[in-house]
Amino acid sequence: REMPSGAAPRVLAVQDTTPKPAVSFGAFIDTYFAWDFGQPDAFHRPYTTQPARHDEFNVNLAFIEARLAGEKIRGRVALQAGTSVQANYAGEPSIGSVSGDDLARIIQEAWVGVRVSPKVWVDGGIYFSPIGWESFISWDNPTYTRSLLADYTPYFVTGAKVTWAASPKVTAQLHVVNGWQIVSENNPDKSFIARVEWQATAALALAYAFYAGNEQLDTLPARTRYYNQLLAKVAAGHGWDFWGTFDVGVQTVPDASSQTWYGVVAIGRKALSKKVAVVGRVEGHSDRDQVLILTGTPDGFRTIGGSIGVDVQPEEFVKWRTELRGFSSSDPVWPDQGAPTESELGGFIVTSL
């Protein structure tokens, strides 16, 4: 039928069916009491950040968060406080007038991401480290405290990443970051992280992570760090889960030699019921050259350890966790109840709600 003269053509309204991004809010509090058998001076526990204090009630980690989740955009902003936060941001660089831990430690994460293709995301900001299985958030970990291996790899990084879902079973990431657990830069160089995850079967997951970057201040000769990590997780059935991690790092030094460290940890967890679980861990960490752990002793930090724990979850959003943990080192590096010399043995018990 002919359109009447002067009549405007009809336009069909096309409705956008893309769901709007959802915004959600959350909060978390992890309180604890820890007793270190070495009874360190000034209530400060050495060499681990969780728990960081001895013989006092305190907050390990508390945060509030806002999340954005959509088909094409995503993000998270979280503000935090706690003794683990103070311990982990103590090494934050303060170069210039707007850097340092005063601001950096308040921000747990602040990042935003966009989906650039059906299988590729690009994210940028401050975000949790892609190295390792163990989270900053104790609730998400099989053991209450992080292993030595995890404590001496980054909790967080600052930069940008590309995530590619290569297949339903394989995911790969590439990160460009400021450095090894820092928010502000300490030199003009950028560092790189790669991670590949493979869900081999419904019960077996494997991952590999690699890091490379200069970790020295701009005023000093470069020290390039190369780090490799292998991870495995097994859901064995009947309430059993197992985690295994091995890492090795090499750092160059100005005289053309290198320094090496390595670590290993194995964790097993058994769910006795829907509300009760037990967990055990064995671990070893060797940093003779004191790249990550400065002891000032001849053999550096060469330590084996273990822990046992009990988790009770009376309500959906409540966990009561208790853990007994011990260490044995080649050198006397642990507090010894106020004695003038330190001990090769260390340990503590911690309970958390």
Q: Model-found features: residue ranges?
A:
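N-terminal periplasmic/intermembrane-space "pro-region" immediately following the signal or transit peptide
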Residues: 1-47
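Transmembrane beta-barrel strands of outer-membrane/channel proteins
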Residues: 27-35, 77-81, 124-126, 174-178, ...
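Surface-exposed coil loops of outer-membrane beta-barrel proteins
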Residues: 36-58, 85-109, 116-199, 207-215, ...
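Residue-level signature of outer-membrane beta-barrel architecture
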Residues: 66-70, 114-116, 164, 198-200, ...
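Repeated loop/turn-to-beta-strand initiation elements of outer-membrane beta-barrel proteins
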Residues: 72-75, 119-122, 169-174, 202-208, ...
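Surface-exposed beta-loop-beta
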Residues: 182-261
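Outer membrane beta-barrel transmembrane domains
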Residues: 210-217, 250, 255-258, 269-271, ...
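Outer-membrane beta-barrel "beta-signal"
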Residues: 312-314, 318, 341-353
